């Protein structure tokens, strides 16, 4: 079943169904590992991100439940993140290689990739308690499923519409704020916040795709493109931080400086493209979009009653 909630059905049942499905998929993937343990961890963390986004959208009025379950999901994801984060840096080097301008740049990036791969392997060997962490996360997923019994949401369509619109508006306000800060100060944390807001918007468009399939699918494609640009940008920020904290991983100082110059150039390109696209993705005001969501929800619910 898709990551979707239908306005013509009780909101509580829809949210519980999606939440249970994400947690059950995470459990199944971590237990069966069809593509290996590390891919299973990567997939489970995606389940957690989707569920955290769902709670962020619909639980603006139930802060206690949201706070508790958000902490559960955040901690579960973090406990499994070490090796995945190290693997992501290898993928970042591969992205840089695709944008190398000279042979010297290509050689420098290739050498960095080899060193990052060695670092990832060392981390994997050192993380001897990974299986215990996976077992603990599976237990937390089951506890998260049990917690759904305590979830409370409005049953009337107009109240549900207002609640979802409130969450939608809050997300877009955060996106606009992050966008303006990114344009002004341009620091890595602002772009990271913009990425998180864009990712939430992309997932929300999927959640409510039934409201207006053609328009939401077009917006979702633009949002996904923005998420990808900002994802690469953030990965380069993480790689820069590693260069600062563990320069020995990358060899001599001259090589580190050359690699940093390559990173900065690509990061500037990504930021320029992302800001231009973000202006289009978040062109409408949060208030106007929220009003549209509320109206579409009521129309959809009314047409199918």
Per-region residue spans from a language model:
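Function-determining surface determinants
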Residues: 1-305
